[in-house]
Regions:
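N-terminal soluble domains immediately following signal/targeting peptides that reside
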Residues: 1-135
Length: 135
């Protein structure tokens, strides 16, 4: 078995804009002691529309392993980590990352993939939201 680890880094103002339509909102309170009980559900609902990983043609379920905030003010980023146990050897990996392309026409998402000691970087956007790697 191999563990697929997916890390997303999202500016908190963009997350708030996408989820509650107000970049300055403190309604969801990610990673705070009084985090909204609906914060994770709202985040996953949004991400499931704009982000997925398929390993060997099978979509991996997104389950949040952990979250953390980094930075200050408008530069605060929400880091979200997902893990998935991959039982069969990885032959292909299809990635869709159209996160925030609904909000920003020129949004570009940078993807780093590390498999078996080899690293690949991808840039995905509204025009090219998916890419498939074959191993």
């Amino acid at each position: 078995d191999e563990i697929l680890t997916i890390n997303l880094r999202l500016f908190l103002t963009d997350v708030n804009e996408a989820l509650v339509f107000d970049p300055e909102s403190t309604e969801l309170r990610f990673c705070q002691p009084d985090e909204s009980p609906t914060a994770d559900l709202m985040l996953l609902d949004y991400l499931n529309n704009y982000f997925y990983i398929e390993a060997n043609g099978n979509q991996t379920p997104l389950t949040i392993k952990n979250k953390k905030l980094k930075g200050d003010g408008i530069n605060t980023a929400l880091g979200v980590t997902f893990e998935h146990t991959q039982r069969a050897p990885l032959r292909s990996l299809k990635i869709k990352n159209a996160v925030f392309t609904d909000l920003f026409y020129d949004q570009t998402n940078i993807i780093y993939v590390h498999v078996n000691g080899t690293s690949t970087s991808l840039m995905l956007n509204k025009k090219t939201p998916t890419h498939t790697l074959v191993f």
